Amino acid sequence: MKTFFVKPKIYYGRNSLAFLSTLDVNRVCIVTDKMMVKLGVADKIKSYVTHTVCTIFDEVEPNPSLDTVKKALAIFLDDGPDVMIAVGGGSPIDAAKAILYLSDEISKQIPFKRPLFIAVPTTSGTGSEVTSYSVVTDTERNIKIPFTDERMMPDIAILDEELTKTVPPTVTADTGMDVLTHAIEAYVTRDANEFTDMYAEKAIQAVFTYLPRVYRFGGDMEARGQMHLASCMAGIAFNNSGLGINHSLAHALGALFGLSHGRANAILLPYVIQFNAGLCDGTAAISPAAKKYASIAKMLGLPCSSTEEGVISLVAAVKYLQKVLDIPETLAAAGVDRKELDDCMSFIIKSAREDVCTAGNPKEVRPIDFTHLLNWVYEGDQ
């Protein structure tokens, strides 16, 4: 028996933020970051809930730390809001999820009413507004901790593309490639099904169609709107099917070398596709993952006279997209130091093997496979 979980309720399109003015509540807590305050986005959100007592926590960093989450939690518990609104990229939403999860754990000892949780993404990348996943950083151990619990799922998501129009090209590229990685991994994971395939396929098509457009022309609101929906669709897909080692390695590399999550995923993607498909060991003809990758190639209208050709075509298409988006092809080109990578190799492999995403990977991965893969991603095709 298979299952497919769909939540939250989604308001989308231009001016969908106006939904906030319909809230009949007394206390609101907004979780965001300094940039959202500087750009006036936090005040815009606040303007829709003027009839409430509103607290703004704006200290979420790009990779939310456990310390920040704990600090926000103390304010959150003291404030006792009726509604929590997470506004920003994946980091504020992930932080809000962690706050909600920890407050729910605390409520087992101290009575605390769960607030309505509204997620308002301002980038098109993580899909965090429709997932029960969160990633926080343990700065003491220098690792990213991905975890999942249905209690972290937002109750409402608001997808207003107007909030994405100030996102700079580099961030647009990185977050857009995160969408593509989510969708492709969700499509080939062990628990993929007919429903997740449907959402993943739509997201993949949208990325190849609209991401180059919005990267070149940031004011293309049609493209921004479609990428916002693609991010959400990919999130729905992977929340049900899981992810794979692309994300496991990206979590470790991002924490150690300061790479943005989307950029780390983008650099890894062509290599992970080839590894999972069996192009490296000659098993592509019988690999279930290879057949799924080839299906993507066929859907995109790429050469696909055989399974192997389909995989090769998809890899070439991903690499071309990277080039269009000015994303480096290797870890070396991204500025990662060779010696530092070697020194951290065992730690990266251990982190990736323990990462919750690895269980969904379509192919078993041995420690030696991780080593070869990381060396390959560092050096590129020689």
Across the structure, where does each feature detected by a protein language model lie?
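ATP/NTP phosphate-donor binding region
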Residues: 1-83, 331
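A glycine/threonine-rich phosphate-anchoring loop and its flanking beta-alpha core
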Residues: 8, 101-194, 288-295
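Acidic-aromatic/histidine active-site loop/patch
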Residues: 90
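Glycine-rich phosphate/pyrophosphate-binding beta-alpha loops
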Residues: 125, 232-265, 355-360
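C-terminal and late-domain segments of enzyme folds
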Residues: 173-233, 237
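Flexible, glycine/charged-enriched surface loops at secondary-structure junctions
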Residues: 192-199, 215-226, 241-246, 283-286, ...
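Gly/Pro-rich interdomain helix-loop hinge
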Residues: 263-340
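Short, amphipathic C-terminal "tail helix"
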Residues: 340-382
